[in-house]
Amino acid sequence: MASDAPVRVRFAPSPTGRLHIGGLRTALYNYLFARKHDGDFVLRIEDTDQARYEPGAEDDIREALAWTGLEHDEGPEQGGDYAPYRQSERSEHYHEYAQKLVEAGRAYYAFDTEEELEELREEHGAYDGSTRRQMRNSLTLSDEKVEQRIDEGDDYVIRLKVPRQESVQVEDEIRGTVSFDTSEIDDQVLVKSDGMPTYHLANIVDDHLMNISHVIRGEEWLSSTPKHVLMYDALGWEPPAFAHLPLILSPNGGKLSKRDANELGIPVYVMDYREAGYEPEALLNFLALLGWSPGTEEELFALDEMVETFSLDRVGASGVQFDLDKLRWVNEHYVRALSVDALAEKARPHVEAAGYDVSDDRLQTICGLVQDRIQVVPEVVTDNRYFFEDPEAYEEAGVEKRWNEESADLLLAYADRLEGVDAFDTDTVETELRDLADEKDVGAGAIIHPSRLAVSGRSYGPGVFGLLAAVGKEACIRRMHRAVEALG
């Protein structure tokens, strides 16, 4: 692709399952590169593998991109100059160019049965330049026999004819020049027996016809790239620029598999992060730094700031470990930047899912108290249930440290005072506590700490007066009496 050509990149997932977190990073890097260079970001659905097609997967992909704000310029829904954008709707293109490869002597028909292929795999390993002459294909059969078999409806595939003992050079924007020995490359199937193209053929045909300038994808596709380069050469096309992103590794160092992720509590699928209460901006911020370095110490970037700073030459080639604690740290900053109203709105579904009925005003009060103490929105509920229900137990270390022989009497006296107040707000509960402390000639802490334990079951949390006011008069008094009964 000429260096002065307009930048056009594509995110081309297969709808064989929900969108993986690694797929979102690929989409993000494509998006950032396109926006940085005033180019086009294309969504293309690569659904040629009908056997693995999963209903709903395409909807999940679109929903994940919409949730994270990665808006594409062209795609199956909005169309574009290069429509259609589902490969299952573009089959005529693939058959046309597969035939051209055959006519050019760069691909061939193969009629081998599954049994013959299995025998080949067991004896020789690969269908390639050293073994294809032993098989039933258009290289070993006469033209008449090939035509006859096709006319009779025999099953066949079309395979790429990989040259023997050559070196294929792949120029990668991240890794530099990568060389591949063709003796280690198999004769890839390009068209399957059901007539559907494989990823490899459909991929290069669509990238060419859609004028894709840069192919930015995961490292797992690097080993396939020499096959693609051979096809570009055979068809007389200039290949796009390639950039293969580093693997996302588990915290233990290996490739982040679904099993490892589940064991480590790392969500695998993008929409699971929404369910877990992560902010989409935080997730993108975290993923951007999972392979790319901005060249500064700064770690928090809005999407437009990432666009301004992003470049492929600052993307590393080595795998990067997924650090869930780091993601939570990033998310914490985004949660703290929310307005209290926005946090309450985001928390509302989690509150209701937990079965709590809370007014808007009270929920906003609670959110204001806990906002700087949580990392993800659901923790408004999960880490602070004492706002919504009486504690079932009392923190042992807190009781040992904060509850003494005077605590019960002081707490009951405080409960009596609270019983008589009309306005149950922060100022009132503080005034009553400090007046009682003066009356009893004790420090305020002698009442504050038992009150916190009684009302929340903990020795830590938001300011005690805000806590009491948010829990409410009736609940506070009830909890204080229950604590005295339980702790003596």
From Swiss-Prot:
Keyword Nucleotide-binding applies: yes
Gene Ontology molecular-function annotations: ATP binding; glutamate-tRNA ligase activity; tRNA binding; zinc ion binding
EC number(s) stated in the UniProt entry for this protein: 6.1.1.17
Keyword ATP-binding annotated: yes
CC terms in the record's Gene Ontology section: cytosol
Main location: cytoplasm
Annotated stretches, region: Disordered: 71-90
Homology family: Belongs to the class-I aminoacyl-tRNA synthetase family. Glutamate--tRNA ligase type 1 subfamily.
Function as written in the Swiss-Prot or TrEMBL entry: Catalyzes the attachment of glutamate to tRNA(Glu) in a two-step reaction: glutamate is first activated by ATP to form Glu-AMP and then transferred to the acceptor end of tRNA(Glu).
Protein name, UniProt field: Glutamate--tRNA ligase
Record organism: Salinibacter ruber (strain DSM 13855 / M31)
